[in-house]
């Protein structure tokens, strides 16, 4: 009778737990444990504590249960759940993996292990766990949803879209599934389809900010800018706009030439999670006060290309009577050390040991500070100092006799860049321009494995990049070239800032500074822009480049070495 009595107390606790009466559940289960501390009672006590948000206590209780029954896979699973709630992901994964040793075919443990592996950045292992979970328990919407998202992070967008559609068929009321499916389709260039899925997500969950932001971004890539601005206002009315919304609207303003609103909005970048600009006690200068006699720190706050692009403003600060301290990324320091108007150069890492300054300005805020409009862009070229003659001569000697047009090539940027898929070109695709009668020189540092393979196969590209130790060396090599053909990377900005003839290959929706519907750049007079059409492919762009390159190469007159 006593055993039956404790079981009844435990059962009462479970009933209270089911009805979400957590205090009553705890009371009944504790009574049962006092009479008989069985592992199953302790497990229920742990669950009640979990539901109460008392995770550390729950973990201690479940650990006690495991000591009594160490081969119980369910207890190890529960331990993994609690550790996940405590954000102790490595320990949670270890608990789930131990549970799988005891019960290898438990699909939910496989799914949870896959989710944790993804959070820990071990995506290939995560997919393997989810594949097995799917085989053991097919057509399980949460598994498919998680698998679709991990495939997306692995840039396997076709597979991600397929899994997302399967998940949606099984759980059509899940807004996150619709939203993630839209993301995969957008990465595949299927923006109209993506737009429909974002709208479906919003219909299911009318306040899903991520879906609104993704819809806005898709309208941006469709060049439907009036709708971008209207949607932004609608989001504000709903209280849904955030820094991501404001950032994308600012980029749309700049891309469409509305610099006044665009530069103001551009400041939102400093509030994004990715912002890298240090905090200083001194005031920020944005053009609103006289700087004559003041010392101003100008520090890089975005990428290498942005620093090269906006360093043109530094001499303008000096012309206003300011003493300028310049902090740029290490690969740029030697290149910019002779720059006019700079009183003192400091490394980016010296934020804690800076000399005295009165004001500071992020380098990408200088266009705002100077009130830059399309017709006032400072474009006197070159604005970077010419590389030393001895370094130019050294590179010229390495390239040999100048019997043919010398063309520098850069075909990809940072793989982690949000727009990498659109702006980078596989070397095998770029190779269609290489039949021109020219000497091709790689400017591509750190080619991707697939591109490195192609580079080894080809004997018509001179690759000296191992000796391009910083941007000063790259600038010296560029000074020996007749033309640079590049995608939108720091190489493009370096070539433009040196005043080198440059052909820039652009995606359908480019970075804001290249504007729309023009073949020239007001920022870089020596640059020509070759844009994708609405078809969003580079083959036709490269065909145009090849035709023009052949004509240019055929008219080249050899010069003495």
Where are these regions (language model features)?
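Alpha-helical solenoid repeat scaffolds of the TPR/TPR-like class and their adjacent stem/linker regions
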Residues: 1-483, 488-561
């Amino acid at each position: 009778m006593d055993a039956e009595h404790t079981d009844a107390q435990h059962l009462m606790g479970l009933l209270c737990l089911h009805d979400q009466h957590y205090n009553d559940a705890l009371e009944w289960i504790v009574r049962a444990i006092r009479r008989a501390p069985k592992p199953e009672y302790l497990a229920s006590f742990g669950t009640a504590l979990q539901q109460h948000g008392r995770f550390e206590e729950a973990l201690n209780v479940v650990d006690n249960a495991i000591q009594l029954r160490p081969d119980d896979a369910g207890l190890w699973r529960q331990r993994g759940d609690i550790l996940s709630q405590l954000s102790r992901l490595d320990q949670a994964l270890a608990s789930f993996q131990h549970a799988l040793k005891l019960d290898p075919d438990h699909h939910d443990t496989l799914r949870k292990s896959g989710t944790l592996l993804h959070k820990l950045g071990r995506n290939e292992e995560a997919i393997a766990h989810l594949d097995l979970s799917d085989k053991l328990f097919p057509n399980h919407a949460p598994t498919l949803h998680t698998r679709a998202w991990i495939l997306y992070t692995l840039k396997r967008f076709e597979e991600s879209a397929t899994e997302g559609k399967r998940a949606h068929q099984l759980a059509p009321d899940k807004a996150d599934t619709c939203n993630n499916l839209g993301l995969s389709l957008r990465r595949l260039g299927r923006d109209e389809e993506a737009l429909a899925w974002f709208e479906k997500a919003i219909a299911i969950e009318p306040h899903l900010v991520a879906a609104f932001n993704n819809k806005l971004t898709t309208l941006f890539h469709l060049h439907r800018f009036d709708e971008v601005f209207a949607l932004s206002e609608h989001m504000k009315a709903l209280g849904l706009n955030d820094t991501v919304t404001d950032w994308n609207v600012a980029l749309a303003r700049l891309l469409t030439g509305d610099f006044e609103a665009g530069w103001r909005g551009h400041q939102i970048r400093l509030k994004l999670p990715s912002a890298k600009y240090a905090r200083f006690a001194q005031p920020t200068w944005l053009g609103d006060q006289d700087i004559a006699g003041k010392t101003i720190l100008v520090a890089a706050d975005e990428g290498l290309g942005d620093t090269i692009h906006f360093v043109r403003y530094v001499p303008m600060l000096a012309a206003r009577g300011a003493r300028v301290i310049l902090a740029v990324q290490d690969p740029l320091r030697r290149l910019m050390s002779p720059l006019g108007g700079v009183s003192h150069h400091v490394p980016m890492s010296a934020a804690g040991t800076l000399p005295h300054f009165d004001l500071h300005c992020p380098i990408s805020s200088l266009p705002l500070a100077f009130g830059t409009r399309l017709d006032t862009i400072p474009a006197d070229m070159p604005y970077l100092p010419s590389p030393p003659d001895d370094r130019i001569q050294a590179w010229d000697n390495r390239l040999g006799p100048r019997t043919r047009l010398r063309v520098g090539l850069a075909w990809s940027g940072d793989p982690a860049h949000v727009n990498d898929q659109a702006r980078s070109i596989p070397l095998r695709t770029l190779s269609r321009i290489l039949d021109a009668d020219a000497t091709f020189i790689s400017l591509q540092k750190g080619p991707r494995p697939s591109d490195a393979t192609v580079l080894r196969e080809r004997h018509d590209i001179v690759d000296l990049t191992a000796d391009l130790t910083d941007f000063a060396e790259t600038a010296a090599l560029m000074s020996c070239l007749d033309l640079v053909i590049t995608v939108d990377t720091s190489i493009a900005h370096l070539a433009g800032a040196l005043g080198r003839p440059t052909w820039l290959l652009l995606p359908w929706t480019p970075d804001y500074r290249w504007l729309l519907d023009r073949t020239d750049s007001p920022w870089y007079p020596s640059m020509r822009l070759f844009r994708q059409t609405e078809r969003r492919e580079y083959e036709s762009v490269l065909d145009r480049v090849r035709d023009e390159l052949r004509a240019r190469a055929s008219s080249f007159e050899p010069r003495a070495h």
